[in-house]
Amino acid sequence: MEVPFDAQKWHEALGHPDWYIRLGDDFKRLEALAKDNPDAKTKEPAYTAVEAALHEGQLPLGDSGEDFDEDRRPIDTIVVHHTKNKPGMPLARLNAMHLLRLYGPEYARESRPYHGQPVWSGHFYQDKQVFWGYHWLVRQDGAAEHILDDRYIGWHAGNWDVNTRSVAFCIDDDLTEKEPSHLALRAIAAAIRKNYPQVKQENIIGHCDVVDTVCPGKLFKPSWRGKLLALLEA
């Protein structure tokens, strides 16, 4: 199925501070198409456009703004996610996806004081402002990268209370119907032992335990959550 996507419209709109208002309805349409046909890459052109605009410096970003991290609390919860994409997700792509899916809708809310303003996250990685919601990205080969400082609230769980007191681990793969590699689980366990020894095992949960989603996969609760907890004890 060919997805109708107006590349010129997106290119022009992404040059404005309120791009998320100008493109909000269009992206909602793409999301609706994606729900009707999950296998189609209906949202990919939008992600590509945002990624390119960020890379080229076309998309205006705020240089100051709301302190979204003032609600940060002591970490007592680990939330596990998957990218639901094929392995090898570039950080630039993840950044574009979360800017469009998370920050765009928030800034588009008319009740917000920052409505219509350039998007500002206040989150920085390697001296660049970033918008991804995960603190850790874990590859299937066991490489684990701490991509969001723990002092930042990651926008990942779909529940602000959980966000304020959690860190998010995301496995770089589509785990809807399969388990992550042993190397990936071992990397997560090692990172938890080293950085978050205070988190109780019952508070190591999946995204599916917070909101109605399959993430991080159908086998998380019946199978590989237990394997992760066993590795924590090893």
Give the predicted meaning of each segment:
Residues H156-D161:
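Flexible, surface-exposed loop/gating regions in the mature catalytic domains
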Residues E66-R151:
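Secreted/periplasmic proteins that engage bacterial cell-wall peptidoglycan
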Residues M1-T83, K128, Q140, A144, ...:
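Basic/polar, cationic surfaces and motifs that engage anionic cell-wall
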